[in-house]
């Protein structure tokens, strides 16, 4: 599975490592992806998502039903 958040769409960023002498080498900044189950009360079932921790905070704030509805509207 690719490291992309299914809620926010966040993915890795590319940047530089900087040594003491300021030499630049490429590196990846990975996001904190968690595989998490969310309970949907309306359907009485769990849904499994690959979500960043920022996406989890968004779900806690808005509610899983609202977020799922918004994702389905984008498709």
Swiss-Prot record:
Any Gene Ontology CC annotation: cytosolic large ribosomal subunit
Alphabetic keyword roster: Ribonucleoprotein, Ribosomal protein
BP GO terms, sorted: translation
Cytoplasm among keywords: no
One annotated GO molecular function: structural constituent of ribosome
Disulphide bonds in the chain: none
Domain of life: Bacteria
NCBIfam families: L28
UniProt similarity note: Belongs to the bacterial ribosomal protein bL28 family.
Protein name: Large ribosomal subunit protein bL28
Source organism per UniProt: Buchnera aphidicola subsp. Acyrthosiphon pisum (strain APS)
Gene: rpmB
């Amino acid at each position: 599975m690719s490291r992309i958040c299914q809620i926010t769409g966040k993915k890795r960023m590319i940047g530089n490592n900087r040594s003491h002498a300021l030499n630049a080498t490429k590196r990846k900044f990975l996001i904190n992806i968690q595989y998490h189950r969310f309970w949907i009360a309306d359907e009485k079932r769990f849904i499994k998502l690959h979500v960043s921790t920022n996406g989890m905070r968004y779900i806690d704030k808005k509610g899983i039903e609202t977020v799922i509805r918004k994702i389905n509207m984008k498709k």
